[in-house]
Amino acid sequence: MKWIEVSIKTTSEAVEAVANILYDGGVAGVSIEDENDFSLLEQSNEAWDYVDEALLDRELEGALVKGYLPEAADLAYKLELIRQSVALLPKYGLNIGLGEVTTLEVNEEDWSHSWKKYYKPTHIGKNIVVKPTWEEYERKEGEMIIEMDPGMAFGTGTHETTMMCAQELEKIVGAKYTVFDIGCGSGILSIVAAKLGAEKVIAVDLDGTAIRVTQENVDANDVSDIVEVRHGNLMDVVTSRADVIVANIIADIIILLSKDVKNFLKKEGIFIASGIILDKVEVVKAQLIANNLEIVKVETMGEWAVIISKLKGGVDE
């Protein structure tokens, strides 16, 4: 079967928005190459041990997001829709850089596995290592290994937002904790929480592919007795409360979620919110405060932030 590879040159800031546009346009799988990932690796000598040397020869400015569309009658319409949607992003405050959209015809076998050669075992926390299921890795003492095959779902663990969320979970989650993972993607944060000792984790996503991939990764990591995967949104599929809620999505959705998240947190419950570009931090903080949440701290990595907040004054349980 023939596929059309759609490549979009953009910025690290716009990566998630561009990826979402591709998914909305009907792509089957997304890959992301981001120069910020290399900058982060340069800050950690240890991480270089896990990078394919072929990557170091690749010249990349900004970010390159690729998606794949089947060659079909409505292809031209979908491509035009993608181009128009990318062009509109600056109106929402995003710097898209070149915003250049190009296409290339490829065979299915060319794209469905080629991205795997760039996905290597990576430290995403003090003791957390994400390892692709097809890679060999010798575990060091004290390390927690997360086996991942993200498939078509967003979330390999190497993005700044995922790393920051994982690092905060590593500091916070303990035995008997209940954790909700909102917009679970590939399930990586749910698995991290489970392996950190959480008693119960509920992973929620609106996307059917994300639900399937999360369940597969949960099973592969032997945490299906802890992690329950639910299809839908938080308000519709969850009725209980959590000690920690983590949401690695985008700023606008965090703002919407802030209105309801207090109804799902236990007394002194913690809300870990990421997927937030630096320009949106103050707006998100203001909304969290307006909805009875107290800002604990803000951490940044590259052009992204994670905001940690907690419920003011507790709740009646």
Curated annotation (Swiss-Prot):
PANTHER family to which the protein is assigned, alphabetical: ELECTRON TRANSFER FLAVOPROTEIN BETA SUBUNIT LYSINE METHYLTRANSFERASE
Location(s) in or outside the cell: Cytoplasm
HAMAP family recorded: Methyltr_PrmA
A matching Pfam family: PrmA
GO molecular function: protein-lysine N-methyltransferase activity
Gene Ontology CC: cytoplasm
Entry annotated with the keyword Secreted: no
Keyword Transferase: yes
Task of the protein: Methylates ribosomal protein L11.
NCBIfam families: prmA
Domain of life the protein comes from: Bacteria
Location (main, coarse): cytoplasm
Protein's name in the database: Ribosomal protein L11 methyltransferase
A GO biological-process term: methylation
